[in-house]
């Protein structure tokens, strides 16, 4: 359960876009931003922006401001204040302290090599050793082996992964993504998460966290991934090029085509606000591609 009470908002639709500041927004980021924006606005909901700056060694100086500037340039205006995870460490630590005190979490000193020797999944080796340093793992009492995706139906998680006691605070003192994102979504009243299909497996762990916290899980919608011509996911880690800030309308239209919109010719003559308004009015989940990976001509807007 939660160590203290979150201030819950109303149950009207609240979505969010939560990029990490490890580089500029690329075409794959735009897909996630647009999908979450259209899903929220088509339901007259709020669209929040949260900067997930949990991992300083991987962050690019100035990237957070550049991301926000890019969203504004593309007229993807968010509701409320931007939230930064780097300012919320107290929230994460309070929950971890509660779990440590209750015995729900424990320290682990197993190396990656040791876990590989276990078969690739952590087997709970340190659970009863009563260590006082290392990474912190959560005892998994609510494993999730499947969940319902709003577009793709039932999604399955490998049993070994679902049952694993996963890390909630790293050995280097950095907070783990799964814990932070769930606590933030609860705190911000998020009702639905729209994001890329590369996060399907973490979804199981996040639903487990909701249940262990005594909270109702959000709904999930996973969007197809934009791949480059070599079949690699467009990502900051793969050095994907930032999207063009000088021609946002054409980039928005290309991203909308990727998301399955049948774009009328006249929309190519419309301004940015008109394009986005049309997108909100014509957004349908059943138009999204069934494939979760799309290797096509899309590569940051270039053929």
From Swiss-Prot:
GO terms for biological process: glutamyl-tRNA aminoacylation; tRNA modification. GO terms for cellular component: cytosol. Its EC number is 6.1.1.-. InterPro entries: Glu-Q_tRNA(Asp)_Synthase, Glu/Gln-tRNA-synth, Glu/Gln-tRNA-synth_Ib_cat-dom, GluQ/Sye, Rossmann-like_a/b/a_fold. ATP binds at residue 236. Catalyzes the tRNA-independent activation of glutamate in presence of ATP and the subsequent transfer of glutamate onto a tRNA(Asp). Glutamate is transferred on the 2-amino-5-(4,5-dihydroxy-2-cyclopenten-1-yl) moiety of the queuosine in the wobble position of the QUC anticodon. This is Glutamyl-Q tRNA(Asp) synthetase. It comes from Vibrio vulnificus (strain CMCP6). The lineage of its organism: Bacteria, Pseudomonadati, Pseudomonadota, Gammaproteobacteria, Vibrionales.
